[in-house]
Amino acid sequence: MLDISNTTWDLSNQSVLQPLWDYLQQNHESSLRSPLFPVILSVSMYLVLVFFYTVLDLLAPTWPSIRRYQIHQDRTVTWSNIGSTLALTTYNHLLYIFPAAVAQWLWRPPIPLPREAPTLTAFLLGIVGCTVVFDFQYYLWHLLHHRVGWLYRTFHALHHQYRQTFSLVTQYLSAWELFSVGFWTTVDPLLLQCHCLTAWAFMLFNIWVSTEDHCGYDFPWAMHRLVPFGLWGGALRHDAHHQLPGTNFAPFFAHWDWLGGTATMPAPVKTKKRDDKEA
C-alpha cells in the first residue's frame, strides 16, 4: 500500500537544487572535488566580469547609450589605466594565487561531496549569511586600515591610487589585502557550515558585487537599485569612498556606515549631469 503521507514528506524535503547537484556530481565529480576548483571558478568569474566592463569602458567615449550610465562622464578609462591595473592583477595571481592553488592541489586531499543538495532556503540563507559576515569583517578591516596611518600606507594606499573606480581596480590590491579578502571568502562558509554548493555560489556572488562596486556605472539593474530601503551601498557609495576616503567603509551593506557615522550619500548620475549643465 502506498504511504501517501511519507511520499508527500519526502517530496516536500527534496531540494529543488537536487537535479542540478546530481548532474554536477555525475558528470564533473573529479573537477568539483579538486582543491583547484574554487580558484579556477573565482578567477574565471572575475575575468569574465572585468572583460565585460572593460569593453564598456572602451566603447563609452563613442557610445552615448553606455556613457549615460557612467558615474564620471567627464573621465575616460585609458589603455594606460587598463595596463597598470591588469599588470598588478596578473602579478598577484602568478606570485600568490597560483602557487597557493598548486600547494593545495599537491598536499590537500580531494574534497568529499555530500550526496544531497542544500534546500533552496538553506542555499539562499547561506549566501545572505556569508555576505553579512563578510561585510562586517571587511568593514572593520577597512576602517582600521584607514584610521591607522601605517596600515594605510603599507597595505591599503595602493588601492586608492585610483580615485575613479573601474572594474580592474577591484583587485588592484596589496598582497595582504588580497589574502584577507580570500581568507574570509573561504572561511565564512565553513564557519556557517554551508553546503559546498552554497560556498561556491557565495564566492561567485562576492566577486560579482565587488566588481560591480568598482565598475564605475550606475545601471538600472545594479544591486543598490534592487535591494530596497537603501540597505545596499553599491557602485555610487563606493565611488564616493574613493573620492572621500574617510567615508563608506562597508563593502556591501550600508548599515555599518550609518551606525558608525561614516556614511555619505553620493549624488545620482542624472543629478550630476544636470548640475554640470547648470555650472
From Swiss-Prot:
Domain Fatty acid hydroxylase positions: 128-262
Enzyme class, broadest EC rank: oxidoreductase
UniProt GO molecular function: C-4 methylsterol oxidase activity; iron ion binding; steroid hydroxylase activity
Glycosylated sites: 6, 13
Motif Histidine box-3, chain ranges: 237-243
Motif Histidine box-2 per UniProt: ranges: 156-160
TM spans (from-to): 36-56, 86-106, 120-140, 165-185, 189-209
InterPro entries per the UniProt record, alphabetical: Fatty_acid_hydroxylase, Sterol_Desaturase_Related
GO biological process, one term: cholesterol metabolic process
Topological type in the membrane: Multi-pass membrane protein
Cofactor: Fe cation
Function: May catalyze the formation of 25-hydroxycholesterol from cholesterol.
The name this protein goes by in its record: Cholesterol 25-hydroxylase-like protein 2
